Structure formats: C-alpha cells, structure tokens
Amino acid sequence: MLPIEVVAVPQGEGKIQITGSLGDVMKESAQLAITYARVHAPEYGLDPNSIKKMDLHIHAPEGAVPKDGPSAGVTLTTALMSCLTGWPVRCDVAMTGEITLHGNVLPIGGLKEKSMAAYREGMKTVLIPKGNESDLYEVDEEVKKAIQFVPVSDLEQVLKATLEPPAKTEKNKNAQSFISNPAAESPAAAVM
C-alpha cells in the first residue's frame, strides 16, 4: 500500500513539486491528475484559474524507496481532488488504475498481489479498473470474501466512490473556504 499526500498553497505561483523518489511514469501520472483537476474544476465548485495559481506539492512517503508505474494514477487524482475540494477520502477504500488525459481508467498488472496488500491493511473496498475484472479469478478466495471489488472505467466513478462531499448546499461554500485557506492538505489516499 502506498499513501499519497497533497498540499496546496492557494496564494502561490503555480509551482508543482512532486517528491518521494517517484519515477518518470508516476510523475507523468501526477501531471495527468493535475490536468484532470483543472479541466473538471467547475464540476466540483472550483475555479480552474485559482488552481493554476496554486503551488501544489504531491508526495509519496517513504522517500528512500523508489516508486514507479502507472497504477497510482487514480490515487494521485483522488488525493489531489480531496485537497482541492476539502472533501475527505474514505479511509476504508484502496484503489489502483492507470489514467488517461480524458479521465479513463486503464488496466494494471499485479492485481493478485495488490489485492493481498489491501487485505493485509484491512481495506473493505478496492476500486479496480474495469479491464481487470476478468483477473479477479487470480485473487485468493479469502481475500474476495473480505473485500468488495468495484470495477471502474473512469475518474468520475472513482471520485464518487472515494470522496465524501458535504451536503449539496455546502458544496460551493466548502470550495470557497479552501480557496481562502492559506494552505490546505489532503488526507492520504491509498494505492495498491
């Protein structure tokens, strides 16, 4: 399991910092997450121009351990959107999946191993790419009994399943309070 953390400074200069010994593919996934957030900002009560001006810092803890691969795309996006909206990430959900520029979720490798890691961490729900649904036969029966696997095909489904927004009347108020906050941070979202 790999937690992802995001901090945003609204009165910044548009700088983006990505840390935690991330390889090129994972850094590209972070860039995709940022583009997705900017494009879809209005759907979440956010101003895309405000996001452009923010300093963003994305971090994967345990910096001494090199990390790479596209599987963290959904998690990077979830952590970023949590930070920007102020909506917490459900703590009983893990996720995995590569993302595209248009918000599609693509299959990953190692579903069996990633599922076992989620099981060991006590996760109750795991979001997997729809394209990996046929790979569930590889997952141990004990793990399948303990975890609800939710196949997803796009980031909209991921964010609906992972973020806990306030009541609809609070949506824009919450986003505005974030914008006025000198620095906001996301709770960690977990990727397998």
Language model features with spans:
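Peripheral, non-AAA+ core regions of ATP-driven protein-machinery
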Residues: 1-192
